[in-house]
């Protein structure tokens, strides 16, 4: 799992340290981590750029950059950022609920996986690490 987190090391240490300290990750930080981690955003971009990228696509949450995201919302953003396909229910109704269920089913989200629960910065980074590891092994496509 640490391999996935190491691949995010190009980002500034200060930013990662700030995320790790967050008891509830914000939309802007979540969007930035996911898009930079997926290679869809340059690390020199801002959290506002990352949020705007999601807001112009299918995973728009309509939240402010400083608003916290739930596990379901984070899962939806992750599935969108990494192009992870979902099962029948997610395909029919892509929503935070079904995104969280899909990522729990695929062992990306480990432990409790309630769509409305808070996501700490540490857990957000663990989820990205897991996505990168499973993607590398071809188990998410």
Where are these regions (language model features)?
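A contiguous, well-structured pocket-lining segment that forms one wall/lid of small-molecule binding clefts
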Residues: 53
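Terminal recognition/anchoring or ligand-binding modules at protein termini
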Residues: 9-44, 61-141
């Amino acid at each position: 799992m640490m391999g996935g987190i190491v691949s995010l090391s190009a980002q500034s240490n200060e930013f990662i340290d700030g995320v790790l300290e967050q008891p509830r990750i914000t939309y802007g930080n979540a969007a930035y981590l996911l898009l930079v981690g997926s290679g869809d955003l340059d690390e020199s971009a801002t959290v506002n750029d990352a949020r705007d990228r999601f807001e112009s696509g299918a995973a728009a949450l309509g939240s402010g950059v400083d608003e916290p995201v739930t596990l379901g919302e984070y899962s939806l953003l992750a599935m969108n950022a990494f192009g992870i396909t979902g099962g029948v229910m997610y395909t029919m109704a892509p929503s935070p609920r079904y995104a969280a269920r899909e990522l729990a089913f695929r062992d990306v989200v480990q432990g409790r996986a309630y769509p409305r629960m808070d996501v700490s910065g540490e857990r957000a980074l663990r989820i990205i690490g897991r996505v990168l590891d499973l993607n590398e092994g071809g188990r998410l496509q």
